[in-house]
Amino acid sequence: MIDRYKHQQLQIGLVSPQQIITWAEKILPNGEIVGEVTKPYTFHYKTNKPEKDGLFCERIFGPIKSGICACGNYRVIGNEKEDPKFCEQCGVEFVDSRVRRYQMGYIKLACPVTHVWYLKRLPSYIANLLDKPLKELEGLVYCDFSFARPVVKNPTFLRLRGSFEYEIQSWKYSIPLFFTTQGFDTFRNREISTGASAIREQLADLDLRLIIDCSLLEWKELGEEGPAGNEWEDRKMGRRKSFLVRRMELAKHFIRTNVEPERMVLCLLPVLPPELRPIIQIDGGKLMSSDINELYRRVIYRNNTLTDLLTTSRSTPGELVMCQEKLVQEAVDTLLDNGIRGQPTRDGHNKIYKSFSDVIEGKEGRFRETLLGKRVDYSGRSVIVVGPSLSLHRCGLPREIAIELFHTFVIRGLIRQHIASNIGVAKSKIREKAPIVWEILQEVMQGHPVLLNRAPTLHRLGIQAFQPILVEGRAICLHPLVCKGFNADFDGDQMAVHIPLSLEAQAEARLLMFSHMNLLSPAIGDPISVPTQDMLMGLYVLTIGNRRGICANRYNPWNHRNSQNEKIDDNNHTYTKEPYFCSSYDALGAFRQKRINLDSPLWLRWRLDQRVIAPREVPIEVQCESFGTYHEIYGHYLIVRNVNKKIFCIDIRTTVGLISFYREIEEAIQGFCRACSYST
């Protein structure tokens, strides 16, 4: 359906019997009305044609083959000159066979039936509206007991009792024995009520606005009483207040949507289109049918039996009629939600029947599998791995996925560059994986963003845009800083990749969805691209080192890891001479040559033109030389000054990890400054 804001939407709700008839009924040229399914049959075992008025009837649901009726006659579809549109012999309409995907039928129930979703699901809407315990309502629906009708003026058999106690169930064994079907119906219609018809009467008599006013008044009275001092009573009062709030909200919803509460009790049962519950012929001539068909057959069998008891047989005891009504109620319950009342119904092979609820709910249901989470074109899926060398707005796309996603774009590129004369030649070159194919693929990918999505998509950052680049392997490479927005990590998580095709979608991806434009949380405004997990561990490993500073002297075994520089003094003490480097390039070169470790302490000559934070600490020691120069020794660095107190050089005590970390930060700051200068 389409609402007033032109949004396409699907709305599930209660429907009136008149609307069900409108969906299903058709009037034939001879005046006959079709739409009601009265027979529990599917196909004739000899002709393999649908049975008339059965679950696959062509008169009700449309022809199996487009434009061909059950007699075999053919009419051109959509030709207004050819008349009539219905076959005069079989009554089948000459329309497209796709009508069997949406044309519905209905079953006219011999007795009202309560919709089990609104009775047994929690919270029970029927119990909330009637303000009665669910257990008592179940006993009423399944004919375990009854209640008296309030007759004001006329004398009654039950001696004017305004209600029938639920505990008194002796009527179940005594009253029906004194009446035939006709007599018992007269008595029941006048004085007592049971089954779903009793629920329907009570729902029809409800005044929703009065329910809201009374519930609000009771809620205020409970609020004014305050705590009783008894924990049990306080909990009971709290549960009652919560129930009153739910009851008022439910009544307001019925008023707002203009839906009558008695619609929760069914008089007509809709029959799904046959294409949604097919019967398929498999190898060996065997037939495979949907479980929905068998459940519909069960309902029709029991409903027809009840109809016969009420119309044809005049000597059947009333108790048998009520038992048959209970069987009809249970059959409809099994069709709608098998197993909701306890043990599920099974077939001859001890397999549980798949009811209507099982078809639509869950991960493999109709909505999530074929409507919301269905597979779409121009999409792929793979495991994500970390790409530490990637930019924040880039992602690594495996060649196998990229060539499949951009298949049509590569074909167009091959034809435009006159490398292939037609689509067939272009496809053959792609299958052969010619080198020119990868070059064109890279050109196409440079101007086309992709969308990465990780389920479940709980907020806006669950799907972001990236600039793809080709990588080897079969996993999608991702920058670790964007993982928090996806709530992802690299322990086997999978992501879906989609290609925005239209110009509007590409513009939206570039302007709003790129990862480097979503650095803040849209909910609270805090930074969301922050180091987590692997990055924190990597930063810790990079910056770990000798925390004791220069106080760790040569006799301290803390520095034992520089095995190449170990020395033994006269007292047989092992100590390490810390290496000295004139530049960071020399230190990194020594690390690559495995002369030092990542966290090994070393001395590094610091350039005076580099940024230096002025120290506020007092030197640990000052060493003076004969030429007037002196050394100020601090915890992690050493300053050499001349006679005029001018800094001659600075030596810092650091590690290779800290040097690498500093270089990365310095490059990032320089890149940010260049970007700011370009923008101004």
Swiss-Prot record:
The keyword Transcription applies. Its EC number is 2.7.7.6. GO terms for cellular component: chloroplast; DNA-directed RNA polymerase complex; mitochondrion. One of its GO terms (molecular function) is zinc ion binding. It catalyses: RNA(n) + a ribonucleoside 5'-triphosphate = RNA(n+1) + diphosphate. Mg(2+) binds at residues 489, 491, 493. DNA-dependent RNA polymerase catalyzes the transcription of DNA into RNA using the four ribonucleoside triphosphates as substrates. Belongs to the RNA polymerase beta' chain family. RpoC1 subfamily. This is DNA-directed RNA polymerase subunit beta'. It comes from Ranunculus macranthus (Large buttercup).
